[in-house]
């Protein structure tokens, strides 16, 4: 599949490199997810051309598509680090957080537009180092520090963060064409209330100059999601097999892979739904919505199945 974006961290490469360094042993549970997160951060920050989100000089300050991609991918890295800190590496709700993951999660939440005192790149590279420290403890069988619990509830917690991100991005993409949206936040609950009054319906439309930014942010989001879902298939293999959820996960991955196809137009086309010119944002939204529906099904299966 042709793509103009960085290659995904390869799970086969991660496994083979670990085996080459450890006399053919299989990686421990959690190694694929941790290593994929580390490599994705390295790609975001140190890819060809570097990290552009915080550049303040031309021509890079005028190149907003790559910074939008970086924003989407970085948000997913933050979400995964949060899931690892709060859920996946803790045996129960009263257990202690892993200090390396605490530091990594905090460092990843530094402002991506800071270019000095401190620079965003410096903080993100430091976060990757904290993850390497956690990884070293994970593979050390003599250490009691650094664990990874591949349970169905932990996987569900990580997938829920992805589902919310997909839902938000899908709505933003759909707004490339003006549409009336009903206010449904308080629907189906007669006792609910909100802090602010809202009109029953609003017309939502992304400004023309921001359509490509939203599109490339979605590309970055799905790029990172694909990397992490493939890692989950390795580390949560027994959980997914027990729920017979591998086919569903494979279908989600197929939907998201479609979002990474190369664009053959020099600009993000933004036609109407059934007009002569295609609408790339609506096409992207369709794939992400289907992937999100699959994620919701797996989450329900993990919670209730």
Explain the meaning of each model-derived region:
Residues 54-65, 111, 118, 202-212, ...:
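A cross-kingdom feature marking solvent-exposed beta-strand/loop segments within repeated
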Residues 123-253:
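Extended amphipathic alpha-helical interaction segments
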Residues 1-4, 68:
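Long, low-complexity intrinsically disordered regions
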Residues 3, 7-17, 213-216, 222-305:
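A cross-kingdom marker for long, charged
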Residues 46, 50, 79-89, 113, ...:
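Charged/polar positions within long, soluble alpha-helices
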Residues 100-138, 248-273:
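Long, amphipathic, charge-rich alpha-helical segments that form helical bundles/coiled-coils
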Residues 29, 62-76, 89-96, 100, ...:
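Extracytoplasmic/periplasmic, Sec-exported soluble proteins
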Residues 10-123:
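N-terminal Sec/ER secretory leader and immediately downstream segment
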């Amino acid at each position: 599949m042709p793509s103009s974006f960085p290659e995904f961290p390869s799970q086969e490469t991660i496994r083979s490199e670990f085996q080459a360094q450890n006399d053919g042993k299989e990686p421990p549970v959690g190694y694929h997810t941790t290593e994929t997160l580390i490599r994705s951060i390295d790609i975001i920050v140190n890819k060809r051309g570097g990290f552009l989100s915080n550049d303040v000089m031309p021509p890079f300050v005028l190149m907003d598509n790559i910074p939008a991609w970086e924003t989407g991918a970085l948000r997913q890295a933050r979400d995964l680090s949060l899931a690892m800190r709060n859920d996946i590496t803790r045996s129960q709700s009263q257990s202690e957080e892993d200090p390396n993951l605490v530091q990594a999660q905090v460092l990843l939440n530094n402002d991506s537009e800071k270019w000095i005192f401190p620079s965003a790149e410096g903080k993100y590279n430091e976060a990757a180092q904290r993850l390497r420290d956690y990884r070293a403890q994970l593979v050390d069988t003599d250490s009691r520090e650094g664990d990874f619990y591949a349970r169905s509830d932990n996987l569900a917690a990580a997938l829920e963060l992805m589902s919310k991100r997909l839902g938000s991005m899908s709505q933003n993409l759909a707004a490339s064409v003006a549409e009336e949206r009903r206010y449904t936040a308080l629907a189906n609950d007669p006792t609910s209330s909100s802090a602010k009054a809202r009109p029953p319906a609003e017309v939502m439309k992304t400004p023309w100059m921001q359509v490509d930014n939203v599109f490339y942010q979605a590309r970055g989001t799905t790029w990172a999601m694909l990397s992490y879902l493939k890692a989950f298939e390795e580390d949560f293999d027994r959980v997914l097999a027990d729920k017979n959820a591998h086919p569903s996960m494979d279908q989600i991955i197929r939907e998201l892979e479609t979002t990474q196809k190369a664009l053959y137009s020099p600009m993000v086309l933004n036609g109407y739904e059934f007009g002569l010119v295609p609408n790339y944002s609506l096409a992207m939204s369709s794939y992400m919505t289907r992937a999100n529906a699959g994620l919701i099904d797996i989450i329900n299966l993990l919670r209730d199945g």
